[in-house]
Amino acid sequence: MAENKQVDTEINGEDFTKDVTADGPGSENGDAGAAGSTNGSSDNQSAASGQRDDDRKLFVGGLSWETTEKELRDHFGKYGEIESINVKTDPQTGRSRGFAFIVFTNTEAIDKVSAADEHIINSKKVDPKKAKARHGKIFVGGLTTEISDEEIKTYFGQFGNIVEVEMPFDKQKSQRKGFCFITFDSEQVVTDLLKTPKQKIAGKEVDVKRATPKPENQMMGGMRGGPRGGMRGGRGGYGGRGGYNNQWDGQGSYGGYGGGYGGYGAGGYGDYYAGGYYNGYDYGYDGYGYGGGFEGNGYGGGGGGNMGGGRGGPRGGGGPKGGGGFNGGKQRGGGGRQQRHQPY
């Protein structure tokens, strides 16, 4: 019996939580949104709506570049009714990246796929795994000292399972700052919460916003000679062991939630960049990154190709001379020194 594994719905800087949906707007392979969006039954759509997409989503890695949506549907359709399929392609070349996402109409199909000994498509063994839901994070502003930590947790706990609560502390004033971050186990919880941007806790009105990562142009600043280096380097540039590890900006501040969040002092929270993500999303899928120059199956390995600047400098930067990672480390100054704060 095959091992029932789960993998994050994020790969090498991209979020795939929302691009496989019943109405199919996120498709990158042209006809996946139309052909794979429904299976012709409104009753099945209604039944599936009672279950989160994440619970019914399958990641399929190790695909041949020639594998089509139809071939995936023919193979996995025998395990259960398929709601949608999205074969991921490179946006520049249109070439398959060697993996896809499939959403079934029920969770039982995922169990059946996992229970099978092996899966062969186009004479090639593929690697299907249950996709794990992406966490969602909110920013809560306008908190007064009268609102206790426990009241905050209790209030937001009614909307979904809380994974983490971050409450920055003002050392000078010896009190909690007027904002916090709350992470839920599902992005859907955040989507639902944002329908009511103004909430009341203990009779006090607070602002609720989606916590967003630092803009890419700021994130990439470390590649142009940032003080502590943007890229961790190691051995792989992008993918592999090196990875793009910007959880800490090297200055001891949190990375990615700069910008202030409208007067709540969140700018003091620095550059908080949650979870070591690149563009907000982490490296999941046990090596199914496509940073290896789209060679082989388009996943696995480290560095090389379009997004992996060589083998990585020994103490930082992604390129051969610690140069920033892209295109063999030709950018100026990237990363040279190891970050002072290591990500956890």
Curated annotation (Swiss-Prot):
Modified residues (Phosphoserine): S148
RRM domain boundaries: 56-138, 136-213
Predominant location category: nucleus
Coiled-coil stretches noted in the UniProt entry, renumbered to this chain: none
GO cellular component, one term: cytoplasm
Compartment list: Nucleus; Cytoplasm
A molecular function (GO) term: mRNA 3'-UTR binding
A Gene Ontology biological process term: nuclear-transcribed mRNA catabolic process, nonsense-mediated decay
Composition bias, Gly residues: 222-238, 301-337
Outcome of gene disruption: Semilethal in second to third instar. Females are sterile and lay small eggs with a dorsalized phenotype.
The entry's keywords: Cytoplasm, Nucleus, Phosphoprotein, Repeat, Ribonucleoprotein, RNA-binding
Pfam family of the protein (one): RRM_1
Biased composition (Polar residues): 36-49
Presence of keyword Nucleus: yes
Domain notes: Possesses 2 putative nuclear-localization domains, a M9 motif found only in isoform B (sqdS) and a M9-like motif found in all isoforms described. These may mediate interaction with Tnpo/Transportin and Transportin-dependent nuclear localization.
Quaternary data: Interacts with bru1/Bruno; the interaction is direct but weak, and may play a role in regulation of grk mRNA localization and translation.
Protein name: RNA-binding protein squid
Gene that produces this protein: sqd
